[in-house]
Amino acid sequence: MATPHINAEMGDFADVVLMPGDPLRAKHIAETSLEDVREVNNVRGMLGFTGTYKGRKISVMGHGMGIPSCSIYTKELITDFGVKKIIRVGSCGAVRMDVKLSDVVIGMGACTDSKVNRIRFKDHDFAAIADFDMVRNAVDAAKALGVDARVGNLFSADLFYSPDGEMFDVMEKYGVLGVEMEAAGIYGVAAEFGAKALTICTVSDHIRTHEQTTAAERQTTFNDMIKIALESVLLGDQE
């Protein structure tokens, strides 16, 4: 049954959904990576599609920017449409000097300055982590594709334009690989409602050096990330 934010019916979505922030990226993924594609959501322009990858039913849908937006969509996908696994595919900014532009980062866990998981977890700290099997499958898929993926913590920020530059020093000290805006929220939603989740990011810019990838570089590494996500789903089916 349709929700206030998703005009689909039970069965329209696959049990696994890839989720970029940008709905137009969702459309691009559907058009370039899936077969037999059909649109399953267009409410508020948050496009969602279902198709097949090597015969396996997979969906892709945008989640918007920030934890509040992605939390709404992931919650409804899980509780109203039977989705079991969510893979966020997005971009992040690097803070460590050994993390380079275009690196693929697999988010094993996610720190955050958001309070949403504390609200969920009765004002206690919740360890926002990805599902282990999904992490392992993504790592194995990356190796098979010849992509040297990094595995570690992300930082999910509430502010894109943060005034606290000193926090980047703390992130670097604690080994945070990349800064983005959604992973911790998605991991919290998945835990609360009994689903599994993973975040895979490509490094689009470096916060320290102010370097940025070109449009062509972003597209190449974005395609690598999507391939890793899709192949990891197939590996998960073999478990």
UniProtKB/Swiss-Prot annotation:
<dbReference type="GO" id="GO:0005829">
    <property type="term" value="C:cytosol"/>
</dbReference>
<dbReference type="GO" id="GO:0006152">
    <property type="term" value="P:purine nucleoside catabolic process"/>
</dbReference>
<dbReference type="InterPro" id="IPR000845">
    <property type="entry name" value="Nucleoside_phosphorylase_d"/>
</dbReference>
<feature type="binding site" description="in other chain">
    <location>
        <position position="25"/>
    </location>
    <ligand>
        <name>phosphate</name>
    </ligand>
</feature>
<dbReference type="InterPro" id="IPR035994">
    <property type="entry name" value="Nucleoside_phosphorylase_sf"/>
</dbReference>
<dbReference type="InterPro" id="IPR018016">
    <property type="entry name" value="Nucleoside_phosphorylase_CS"/>
</dbReference>
<feature type="binding site" description="in other chain">
    <location>
        <begin position="180"/>
        <end position="182"/>
    </location>
    <ligand>
        <name>a purine D-ribonucleoside</name>
    </ligand>
</feature>
<dbReference type="InterPro" id="IPR004402">
    <property type="entry name" value="DeoD-type"/>
</dbReference>
<dbReference type="GO" id="GO:0004731">
    <property type="term" value="F:purine-nucleoside phosphorylase activity"/>
</dbReference>
<feature type="active site" description="Proton donor">
    <location>
        <position position="205"/>
    </location>
</feature>
<feature type="binding site" description="in other chain">
    <location>
        <begin position="204"/>
        <end position="205"/>
    </location>
    <ligand>
        <name>a purine D-ribonucleoside</name>
    </ligand>
</feature>
<dbReference type="Pfam" id="PF01048">
    <property type="entry name" value="PNP_UDP_1"/>
</dbReference>
<keyword id="KW-0328">Glycosyltransferase</keyword>
<feature type="binding site">
    <location>
        <position position="5"/>
    </location>
    <ligand>
        <name>a purine D-ribonucleoside</name>
    </ligand>
</feature>
<feature type="binding site">
    <location>
        <position position="44"/>
    </location>
    <ligand>
        <name>phosphate</name>
    </ligand>
</feature>
<feature type="site" description="Important for catalytic activity">
    <location>
        <position position="218"/>
    </location>
</feature>
<feature type="binding site" description="in other chain">
    <location>
        <position position="21"/>
    </location>
    <ligand>
        <name>phosphate</name>
    </ligand>
</feature>
<comment type="subunit">
    <text>Homohexamer; trimer of homodimers.</text>
</comment>
<comment type="similarity">
    <text>Belongs to the PNP/UDP phosphorylase family.</text>
</comment>
<keyword id="KW-0808">Transferase</keyword>
<comment type="function">
    <text>Catalyzes the reversible phosphorolytic breakdown of the N-glycosidic bond in the beta-(deoxy)ribonucleoside molecules, with the formation of the corresponding free purine bases and pentose-1-phosphate.</text>
</comment>
<feature type="binding site" description="in other chain">
    <location>
        <begin position="88"/>
        <end position="91"/>
    </location>
    <ligand>
        <name>phosphate</name>
    </ligand>
</feature>
<protein>
    <recommendedName>
        <fullName>Purine nucleoside phosphorylase DeoD-type</fullName>
        <ecNumber>2.4.2.1</ecNumber>
    </recommendedName>
</protein>
